[in-house]
Amino acid sequence: MGFEELLDKVGGFGPFQLRNVALLALPRVLLPMHFLLPIFLAAVPAHRCALPGVPDNFSNEDAWLEAHLPREPDGRLSACLRFTHPQALPNSTLWGEGQNSGEQPEGEPSTVPCPQGWEYNHSEFSSTIATEWDLVCEQKGLNKAISTFFFAGVLVGAEVYGYLSDRFGRRRLLLVAYVSSLALGLASAASVSYIMFAITRTLTGMALAGFTIIVMPLELEWLDVRHRTVAGVLSSTFWTGGVMLLALIGYLIRDWRWLLLTVTLPCVPGILTLWWVPESARWLLTQGRVEEAHRYLLRCARLNGPPVGEDSLSREALNKVAAAERMVRRPSYLDLFRTPRLRYISLCCMVVWFGVNFSYYGVSLDLSGLGLNVYLTQLVFGAVELPSKLLVYLSVRHAGRRLTMAGTLLGAALAVGLRILVSPEMKSWSTALAVMGKAFSEAAFTTAYLFTSELYPTVLRQTGMGLTALVGRLGGSLAPLAALLDGVWLSLPKLAYGGIALLAACTALLLPETKQAQLPETIQDVERKSAPSSLQEEEMPMKQVQD
C-alpha cells in the first residue's frame, strides 16, 4: 500500500484539508504584498532641484522656476538639473545670483546636478525610500536595485528552504520563515541608511522564499490527486486578494516605514496559527517518524469522518508505507538533461518561465504614464487577475495548453508593445493596454503552472517545476533593472518586456500539447513520445487525465 492509498482511507479531501488550506492562506496573501511592495515603497514622486527661497518682492513662482530650471526636450522643467546661474527674465531682478548684474555668460547656459538636493511633491506619497535617501536622477538605479536585491534573496532562499524543509520538515521551516520574515521586516522598516535597507530587504526576500517553497507542498501532500488542481486554483485566488489588499493598504498608509510594518505584522497571527497546521505525514514517514505520522493521520480521519479500519493505520502498515517512501530515489536537476526529449522540454520550459516572470513583474511594477493614480491602478491590476484565471480555465479546455500558453504570452507582448505607439497624451489608451498586459501576463503565469506540471513525468515532476521556478525567479529579479533602460530610450523597457514575452510565446509553440494526453509516469514515457509511431504511444503505461 502506497501513501496515496493510505490518504484515500483517511479522507483525501474533507474538513481537515479545507482547514489546512485556510490556515495556509495567510502566507499566500503576504507574498504579493511584499513582492509588489516597491510600487509604493520605492515610488518616485514629482521632484525638482531644491532652490533658494523666492524673494519677498517676487510673486511669480513659475517665473522663478523658469529662471533656475532648464527644460527637457518634451517641454517639462528638468527634475535633475538647474542652471549654474539663474537666467535673466524680462522685467525681473533675478539675474545676478552669485555674479555682478549685467554679466550674462555667452552661449548656451550651463547646468549642474542639484547641489542642494531635491524638493518632492508629497501629495501622493508622504514618504518613500526615494524621498528618504534621494534615490532619483543619477541615483535612480539604486532605487530600482532594491527590487532586484529582494528577488535575488528569494532566488537564494528558495534553494536553502527547499533543502532544509526536506531535511527538517515543512512545519518547522514554516515557523522559521514566519519568524525571520517578521524580524527582518521590522529591521527593514527601522533602517537608517540605504545600505542597511538593501541588506535587510535582501534577507527578507530569503525569508519569504520559505512561503513559496513550503506552503504548496504542505497543502498538496495532504490532498488526494483528484482535488489538487482545485486546491491550487483556490490558493491562487489568495494571491489575487493580496494584490488588491496592497492597493487598499497603500492608499491608507502613505509613509513607507509604516506601510512596511503593516504588511509585515500579519506574520504574528501566522505564527500562532501554526499550532493547528499539521506536519506532512508523507515527510514524516520518509524520515521513519511513524508515531507522529500515525497521530496526524488519526486526526485527519477523525475530522473527515470516513470509517477507517484498524489494519489501515496499524503500525505495521505504516512501517511498510514508510519503507516504500524511503526507497524512492530523490532526483536532481541533472536528471532533467540526461535524455534528449526531456532535455528539449526542460530548455523550452526554462525560456517560457523566464519570459512569464520577466513580463509579469515588468508589467506589474511599471505603472508610469497611466491615466489613473497609482492606487486605483494597482486595484484594477489585482481585480483583472480573477477574470484572467477564468479565461485560462476555459481556454485550456478548448484550445489546449500549448496554444493558451503561447496566446497569453503573445497577448502580453502585443499589449506592452502597443504602449510604445501610444502618445503620452492618450492616457486612457495607455491604461487600457497596461491592464490588458497585466491580464495576459497573469493568465500566462497560471497556464505555466498547469502546462509545465503535465510535461514532466511523475518521477521528475517536482524537480522539473523546481528548476523552471528557479529560472523564473531569475527573470523576476532582472525585470526591475530593465526599467533603467529608459535612460537609453524611453520605450526600451517596454520593448524588452514585450520582446522577451514574444520569445517565450514562440518557444511555447515548440512544446508538445498535453490536452487529453496521458500523463507520463517515467522518463521512458517522455522519450517514447518523440517516436512517430502512434502505436508506441498507445502502449505507453501512463495514466489518463481529464482535460
From Swiss-Prot:
It holds the Pfam family Sugar_tr. Keywords: Cell membrane, Ion transport, Membrane, Transmembrane, Transmembrane helix, Transport. GO terms for cellular component: apical plasma membrane; basal plasma membrane; basolateral plasma membrane; plasma membrane. GO terms for biological process: alpha-ketoglutarate transport; monoatomic ion transport; prostaglandin transport. GO terms for molecular function: alpha-ketoglutarate transmembrane transporter activity; organic anion transmembrane transporter activity; prostaglandin transmembrane transporter activity; sodium-independent organic anion transmembrane transporter activity; transmembrane transporter activity. Residues 91-103 have a biased composition (Polar residues). The chain crosses the membrane at residues 21-41, 145-165, 179-199, 203-223, 233-253, 258-278, 345-365, 367-387, 403-423, 431-451, 465-485, 492-512. Residues 91-112, 521-547 are annotated as: Disordered. InterPro entries: MFS_dom (IPR020846), MFS_sugar_transport-like (IPR005828), MFS_trans_sf (IPR036259), Orgcat_transp/SVOP (IPR004749). Belongs to the major facilitator (TC 2.A.1) superfamily. Organic cation transporter (TC 2.A.1.19) family. Functions as a Na(+)-independent bidirectional multispecific transporter. Contributes to the renal and hepatic elimination of endogenous organic compounds from the systemic circulation into the urine and bile, respectively. Capable of transporting a wide range of purine and pyrimidine nucleobases, nucleosides and nucleotides, with cGMP, 2'deoxyguanosine and GMP being the preferred substrates. PANTHER family: SOLUTE CARRIER FAMILY 22 MEMBER. NCBIfam families: 2A0119. This is Solute carrier family 22 member 7. It comes from Bos taurus (Bovine). The lineage of its organism: Eukaryota, Metazoa, Chordata, Craniata, Vertebrata. The gene is SLC22A7.
